[in-house]
Amino acid sequence: MKDLKAELEKLLVNAEDCELIARLATEQDKRRTFSRIATQLREIAAELKADIAARSANIS
């Protein structure tokens, strides 16, 4: 479970990094690309968070 929580944290940090890169990018294509990557990472993080919650509920 600790591994999953660590991965969740990494995903969220990477999403924040991509959002920062998107804001600082000078080219429109790069802004869109990094914004899209950030969105995808947040979606994956949400799925992982739900999986962690489901596993925690099963343990209890």
Predicted regions and their residues:
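Long, non-catalytic architectural segments outside compact domain cores
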Residues: 1-60
